Regions:
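Short, surface-exposed linear patches
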Residues: 86-92, 114-119, 127-128
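Short beta-strand-to-loop capping motifs
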Residues: 67-72, 128
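C-terminal or internal capping secondary-structure element at the end of a domain, subdomain, or sheet
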Residues: 121-136
Length: 136
């Protein structure tokens, strides 16, 4: 059986900024790229004799989260995420799914970090060193 579903929580632990938990909006998609090496998709990667030329390049591991719930009056997740993105050290992250699987790695928020004041949601993409590992 194949079981997907909601991300229950995203936890971070930063050596200077401390730890915290982010909660995602239910029923929304998240996209994970576990990273590692990829073979380039190039129609011209072939010799004159027809032998394939294999080009392997490392791909950055990343997770585009479902929208993060934003408590503007108390927890202010947007401020915390911005501080994590702007600090020179990476944090340890874990991503827990409703199906019981937990993934994690060392990384940081990247790209645009915007909060929607109407829906109380934050867009978030995390990038990781090496590969995203399955913890359980």
């Amino acid at each position: 059986m194949f079981v997907g579903g909601d991300i229950i929580e995203i936890k971070y632990n930063h050596p200077i900024l401390g730890s915290g938990t982010l909660y995602c909006k239910a029923g929304e998609d998240g996209t994970m790229d576990r990273g590692g090496f990829r073979t380039a998709d190039d129609a011209n990667a072939v010799t004159g004799a027809g032998e394939m030329i294999v080009q392997l390049n490392r791909s950055l591991a990343s997770f585009e989260t479902p929208p993060i719930a934003w408590d503007m009056t108390d927890k202010d997740e947007l401020e915390k995420i911005n501080k994590l993105a702007g600090h020179p050290l990476n944090a340890d992250w874990t991503i827990t799914s409703v199906n019981g699987s937990i993934y994690g790695g060392k990384g940081r928020p990247v790209g645009e970090i915007t909060g929607n004041t109407n829906t109380a949601q934050i867009t978030l993409k995390l990038a990781f060193e090496g590969e995203i590992k399955k913890i359980s």
